[in-house]
Amino acid sequence: QGYSTVAFDGPPSYGHAPSHHAAQFSNHSFKHEDPIAQQTSLGDQQYSVPPPVYGCHTPTDSCTGSQALLLRTPYNSDNLYQMTSQLECMTWNQMNLGSTLKGHATGYENENHTAPMLYSCGAQYRIHTHGVFRGIQDVRRVPGVAPTIVRSASETNEKRPFMCAYPGCNKRYFKLSHLQMHSRKHTGEKPYQCDFKDCERRFSRSDQLKRHQRRHTGVKPFQCKTCQRKFSRSDHLKTHTRTHTGKTSEKPFSCRWPSCQKKFARSDELVRHHNMHQRNMTKLQLAL
């Protein structure tokens, strides 16, 4: 009771595999606590592609006693190991996987860590489960994105556990959905299309689509309490409100980029400015 079985089957087909990854599948089997086991039917509806494959490798000098988790999918075989190299050594202290190691001892136990860990064993597993792995399963749908999970009990207050693994971009986010939206800047994906007649514009975020559609409908939901003037965007209302307060020169949005002190009156101006920094950084990384 309270456990769901984790089964392993044959190896997937990959274009290549590094020598330190064993391609053998022994009769490994174990169970893990799945606090969201009752929601597996929801998971089945949410994920239409096969679960990702997880593997483990001998800990390197930089992560002795820890486990580097490899996220691999048959849909990303070309830059598979470039992507996994972005992953940090991690523990699963937030996911309550203490029982994962039952019947799967490997000799890498580390008493310095209070949180349960995944240990190196030289095997690859196809994990058939939802629940605690749901957040990581979402990642497989985002090309070039890897999750960063807190590595010890003392780091459970990590505010932004999901990090973009795109080369030259290390932005972190609190929610996986925010990381997914960000990743579309790199992939160019725009899944939201305007359905108004003769308009085929597409957007990477649903809120951008809603804002765009107000141009068609003329809806202006944001009203100034002082003069009753209406606006289609909340940031435009905030900028307008400063004309009543006498703070027209106020610039509350500051650039957080190192050694940059620029400030802006509107948040969208700050976003464009940050994007400029990011583009310059990416160009520099590629040049090196």
From Swiss-Prot:
A motif (9aaTAD) lies at residues 90-98. Residues 1-21 are annotated as: Disordered. The record marks K263, E269 as: Important for interaction with target DNA. PROSITE patterns: ZINC_FINGER_C2H2_1, ZINC_FINGER_C2H2_2. A motif (KTS motif) lies at residues 247-249. Gene3D superfamilies: Classic Zinc Finger. GO terms for molecular function: DNA-binding transcription activator activity, RNA polymerase II-specific; DNA-binding transcription factor activity; double-stranded methylated DNA binding; hemi-methylated DNA-binding; RNA binding; RNA polymerase II cis-regulatory region sequence-specific DNA binding; sequence-specific DNA binding; transcription cis-regulatory region binding. InterPro entries: Wilms_tumour_N, Znf_C2H2_sf, Znf_C2H2_type. Keywords: Cytoplasm, DNA-binding, Metal-binding, Nucleus, Repeat, RNA-binding, Transcription, Transcription regulation, Zinc, Zinc-finger. It is found in: Nucleus; Cytoplasm; Nucleus speckle. Residues 206-220, 232-240 are annotated as: Important for interaction with target DNA. GO terms for cellular component: cytoplasm; nuclear speck; nucleoplasm; nucleus. One of its GO terms (biological process) is ureteric bud development. The keyword Ligase does not apply. PANTHER family: KRUEPPEL-LIKE FACTOR 11, KRUEPPEL-LIKE TRANSCRIPTION FACTOR. Presence of the KTS motif hinders interactions between DNA and zinc-finger 4. This is Wilms tumor protein homolog.
